[in-house]
Swiss-Prot record:
Contains two Ra/cadherin-like domains composed mostly of beta-sheets joined by a linker region. Proper folding and stability are dependent on the binding of one calcium ion per protein molecule. The keyword Disulfide bond does not apply. Transmembrane segments: none annotated. It comes from Rhizobium johnstonii (strain DSM 114642 / LMG 32736 / 3841). This is Calcium-binding lectin RapA2. GO terms for cellular component: extracellular region.
Length: 236
């Protein structure tokens, strides 16, 4: 008797400068038409907040960000980016479990190949900031990044949204986060407007799963921005 659910193994190949993403469920099937990603590399994929909830899972050379709907992004670690030799390839192999929501499950294998590229490219180094509520929250995601051959760095995407540069380096793009709004510029500068009212001592974390930088000549890289904000007693 045929299984009511089937996971087909996945394989994807990207260059190290690509924004690495995809969906593991796109080639899978179930009799009832429902598919959910339940486990990835032995770790449960959280779904309490629905299909948009992100689970962060460490791989051998970077970090996977996966959702119950099967979508994923992958960000190379800084060590892997710097250690890539010309033409070298890294490979991540991960098992994953899917479900139809009715008790039927199956397991697939995901093989991710990442290829080194020849040009000297910009390298995006992950950013971590911590602020207290009431502080002027902001920074520049390009400050710790490494320029390529031409010495230029531009912010092109932020959390999946294109960063406008039509009005020059001071053009501002507004991007809504989980707890507030980012105001970002092509030169990497950002400010953050907290819209939630935090309790004293409460800490929330905004994670921008990737931002994409460019040298203006087609060479790109992606980094992660983590922003921690701690509530203060506004009545003091």
């Amino acid at each position: 008797m045929a299984s009511p659910i089937h996971a087909t193994d996945d394989s994807a190949t990207f260059q190290e400068t690509d924004v690495i993403s995809g969906n593991l469920l796109s080639n899978d099937s179930s009799d009832n038409g429902h598919l959910f990603l339940r486990a990835f590399d032995g770790a449960s994929v959280g779904a309490k907040s629905g299909n948009s909830q992100v689970t962060e899972i460490q791989g051998d050379y970077g970090t996977f960000f996966v959702k119950p709907d099967g979508s994923y992004t992958y960000v190379l670690s800084d060590a892997a980016k710097i250690g890539f030799a010309n033409g070298e390839s890294f490979q991540e192999k991960v098992s994953y479990k899917i479900s139809d929501g009715s008790g039927h499950t199956d397991v697939g294998l995901f093989t991710l190949n990442i290829q080194g590229v020849t040009q000297v490219k910009p390298i995006a180094v992950d950013d971590h900031y911590s602020f207290n509520e009431g502080d002027a929250i902001g920074g520049n995601v390009l400050d710790n990044d490494i320029a390529g051959d031409n010495g230029h760095l531009f912010l092109r995407q932020f959390d999946g949204t294109n960063v406008s540069a039509k009005s020059g380096p001071d053009a501002v793009t507004d991007i809504v986060g989980d707890y507030g709004v980012f105001h970002v510029k092509p030169n990497g500068e950002f400010t953050y407007e907290l819209t939630d009212d935090l309790a004293a001592g409460q800490t929330v974390t905004e994670t921008v799963q990737y931002y994409k930088i460019s040298d203006g000549e087609g060479h790109t890289d992606a980094g992660v921005l983590t922003l921690n904000i701690t509530g203060t007693d506004a009545l003091v």
